[in-house]
Amino acid sequence: MFGISFSELLLVGLVALLVLGPERLPGAARTAGLWIGRLKRSFNTIKQEVEREIGADEIRRQLHNEHILSMEREAQKLLAPLTGQNPPQETPPPAAESPAPSVPTPPPTSTPAVPPADAAAPPAVAASTPPSPPSETPRNP
């Protein structure tokens, strides 16, 4: 944790034994342990609070950016008729629902619809048949 080896720890223990004596050393070790535990807990609490704030700030920043983007899109839609440009197509955000699959529409037919009255007679025969000439009958002079 701090890079303290066992020999350094042993040296600190011997100095504490010489300075405090055998009577006060257990109480001092207990007090030092409590202080170290409190410091660890407070550092962990501060660390969690900072991480929570960073996460909240990031979410707040993301929402702010999305709000700005939506306002820009609305402004472009409103200004598009004035500038003569087509408004940009809206693309859904990545987290949004996927668009419904498009159903292809059949191409329009190029032949005009036939009215029901003409449908009974074939149009090619009716239009191309010339009137029949009168049959020849003998003439009386």
From Swiss-Prot:
Composition bias, Pro residues: 89-115, 130-141
Membrane topology: Single-pass membrane protein
GO cellular component: TAT protein transport complex
UniProt biased composition (Low complexity): 116-129
GO biological process: protein transport by the Tat complex
Gene3D superfamilies to which the protein is assigned, alphabetical: 1.20.5.3310
Transmembrane portions of the chain: 1-21
Subcellular location: Cell inner membrane
One Pfam family from the record: TatA_B_E
GO molecular function: protein transmembrane transporter activity
Record keywords: Cell inner membrane, Cell membrane, Membrane, Protein transport, Translocation, Transmembrane, Transmembrane helix, Transport
Region spans: Disordered: 74-141
Family: Belongs to the TatB family.
Record note on quaternary structure: The Tat system comprises two distinct complexes: a TatABC complex, containing multiple copies of TatA, TatB and TatC subunits, and a separate TatA complex, containing only TatA subunits. Substrates initially bind to the TatABC complex, which probably triggers association of the separate TatA complex to form the active translocon.
Protein's job: Part of the twin-arginine translocation (Tat) system that transports large folded proteins containing a characteristic twin-arginine motif in their signal peptide across membranes. Together with TatC, TatB is part of a receptor directly interacting with Tat signal peptides. TatB may form an oligomeric binding site that transiently accommodates folded Tat precursor proteins before their translocation.
UniProt-listed NCBIfam families: tatB (TIGR01410)
Name of the protein in question: Sec-independent protein translocase protein TatB
Organism the protein comes from: Pseudomonas aeruginosa (strain ATCC 15692 / DSM 22644 / CIP 104116 / JCM 14847 / LMG 12228 / 1C / PRS 101 / PAO1)
Gene: tatB
